Regions:
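Radical SAM [4Fe-4S] cluster-binding motif and immediate context
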Residues: 163-334, 339-341, 347, 351-354
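Structural recognition of alpha->loop->beta junctions
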Residues: 122-142, 278-287, 351-366
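Residue-level detector of anion-binding/catalytic polar loops
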Residues: 57, 108, 285, 332, ...
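Conserved beta-strand positions
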Residues: 6, 83, 111, 230-232, ...
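Flexible glycine/acidic-rich beta-alpha junction loops that bind and position SAM and/or redox cofactors
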Residues: 13-17, 23, 116-121, 234, ...
Length: 583
């Protein structure tokens, strides 16, 4: 039997010495929200997808130390060692390759992941890190071909992620499933790594039936499953697939719309093809929308009837209407916005920021432009190629310097990013509050609807969400960032109790518990950030997968090293933009 070792790059480096690189809630989606900043545990899903779709005895390592990686190399006679990496990890790859050659010389080294865009040709790849094979596309079919295995449908039964308030639990329960619908995007945004990786093509991984079966699996094995993330850079662009999946979800006899929902990505141009109620009936719970900038000319930010022309005011009014319409039905949003685009300058940046705040996204990603040296945008910004680049690989993340701005210094870009996160918290409140408001909108809308699936199934779904999230309201009412937000929380608590009744004894005890824990955390940290928390190491064992029972997890977790806090190596106080006015 073939033996394969899969591994992420060792010891992910904290971003700006402030956040764990794998904690997307802390460093981007709920960043800067004081004690209401969430903490996420995530998984290296691409490697899990590979391990559970080949006929091999496999071990998969998530975020080991170099010592743990070397110990695993020495523990067995591996046939293949597969290492997944991103651009910022490239300096660590040679050390891992050297360890394989030294400790397991018979093994073939396979490298892959989005970091391969930094290795534009075979010679450059060999100079960067020793390897035998490099995957530059969809990994499952690549690996099966390498191992001499026949093709068959891809299964997707990945470990579940989750997010929580870190002062409430040491580790969040896994409640969010994941399903990979496709790689790549046909929009070809100039800064988009995933589109460049697939040369602007869409590489389907799971068809509609595969997505549906993956969603059922997560609910079958875990009654606490809340939603499933469908990964496809613009899933909503493919209306036939969205409608077909929605039909399966609505007609499902076990779970239906009372339980089945998903997060995915959708451009403004894609969303414009739907009536918002269609999306609700199709199971959409949360959508990531790339706003990017008030002044961008990207076609993906325009409605279907705006593709042939560009009127910025009209386009951005459409954007605001889209966010409002989605929120009014209970569909949550993640809005992404980029600082440092060449359409921004010192004169227009306040208007750009104001526009994004007014969209009131449920969650937000506010990033700095990343200029990849191997992509065409690298030539435009004159940053050198992958081997003559001006900036170190460790900078290649959402907040690292990868180009020289023209209208701002790079520190000013970071200041404005921090300031905008802070402003959104002050003016819009914590994302937990925005999410609850949105779910309450969904409940009201569905209860009024004439459509039976909305009035019965989806209203039940939203009621469960509101009841589950409402216990945080006393903490927001007491410790929110300002009187306006605290007042909103009290009013929302009153509305919830009018709809669903006063909390029962057990609920009151839990609300009081949350408030006491929140007060203790606020006394300890105020509005400051928590120390960096190191990424958890986990070792998974997989066997041959073709006959693996569908209703059971296809892996065993055989060893863990829990996350732990570490001292910051350099002081990194939260930046504040001078222009932020706190109401």
């Amino acid at each position: 039997m073939t033996r394969v070792l899969f591994s992420t790059v060792y010891d992910p480096e904290p971003l700006l010495e402030r956040w764990a690189a794998t904690d997307q809630m802390a460093y981007r989606l709920t960043r800067g929200q004081g004690i209401f900043t969430l903490e996420e545990h995530a998984h290296s899903w691409p490697l899990h997808l590979l391990a559970q779709n080949v006929e091999a005895d496999s071990v998969m390592l998530e975020w080991p130390s170099l010592e743990e990686f070397e110990a695993e190399l020495s523990a067995a006679d591996w046939d293949y060692v597969c290492i997944s990496f991103m651009n910022r990890d490239l300096d660590k790859l040679p050390l891992m390759s050297e360890a394989v050659r030294r400790l397991c010389p018979r093994a073939k080294i396979v490298i892959g992941g989005y970091g391969v865009i930094c290795l534009p040709d075979a010679e450059a790849a060999k100079r960067s890190a020793d390897h035998d094979f490099i995957c530059r596309g969809e990994g499952v079919h690549f690996l099966r071909k390498l191992l001499g295995e026949p093709d068959r449908p891809i299964q997707c039964r990945l470990p579940q992620s989750g997010a929580t308030l870190p002062w409430l639990a040491r580790r969040s329960r896994g409640t969010v499933g994941a399903a990979l619908a496709a790689l790549g995007c046909t929009q070809k945004c100039p800064f988009c790594v995933t589109s460049f990786y697939t040369k602007g093509n869409l590489l389907e991984v799971l068809n509609v039936r595969g997505l549906y079966e993956a969603m059922l699996y997560y609910h079958d094995v875990n009654p606490f499953t809340s939603t499933v993330n469908i990964y496809d850079e613009n899933f909503l662009d493919y209306k036939e697939r969205v409608d077909a999946l929605g039909q399966l979800l609505r007609d499902d006899g076990r779970y239906g719309l009372r339980n089945l929902s998903y997060f995915t990505f959708g451009s403004l141009s894609a969303i414009s093809r739907y009536d918002p109620e269609e999306l609700l009936l199709n199971g959409l719970d949360t959508v990531w929308i790339g706003v990017e900038s008030y002044f961008t000319r990207l076609k993906k930010t325009r409605g279907e009837n705006q593709q042939g022309r560009l009127d910025l005011d009209e386009r951005n009014a459409f954007t605001a209407d889209t966010f409002r319409a989605l929120h009014s039905l209970g569909i949550k949003t993640i809005g992404s916005w980029i600082m440092g685009l060449d359409c921004q300058d010192r004169v227009n940046i306040p208007r750009d920021e104001d526009h994004f705040v007014r969209l009131n996204p449920t969650f937000q990603q506010i990033s700095v432009l990343t200029v990849e040296p191997a992509m065409p945008i690298g030539r435009r910004y004159d940053v050198g190629d992958a081997e003559t680049r001006k900036y170190p690989w460790r900078n290649y993340h959402l907040y690292g310097q990868t180009f020289e701005p023209t209208d701002f210094t790079f520190d000013e870009l970071l200041d404005r990013v921090d300031g905008l996160y802070g402003r959104m918290y002050q003016e819009l409140g914590p994302s937990l509050l925005r999410m609850l408001e949105c779910n309450l909108n969904g409940y009201r809308y569905c209860r009024r609807s004439r459509h039976p699936r909305l009035r019965e199934d989806k209203a039940t779904f939203f009621e469960r969400r509101v009841r589950g999230q409402a216990p945080i309201l006393p903490a927001v009412a007491e410790l929110g960032p300002n009187p306006a937000i605290r007042g909103r929380a009290r009013e929302l608590d009153r509305e919830v109790q009018e709809l669903f009744g006063r909390p029962e004894e057990a609920q009151r005890v839990y609300r009081d518990h949350l408030l006491r824990k929140a007060e203790a955390e606020y006394q300890l940290r105020g509005e400051g950030e928590r120390p960096v928390r190191t990424d958890a190491f986990r070792r998974y064992e997989y066997g041959p997968q073709s006959s693996s029972p569908r209703d059971r997890k296809p892996y065993v977790v055989s060893r863990t090293r829990p996350r732990g806090y570490e001292e910051r190596r350099a002081a990194a106080p939260a930046r504040q933009a001078a222009a932020v006015a706190v109401p």
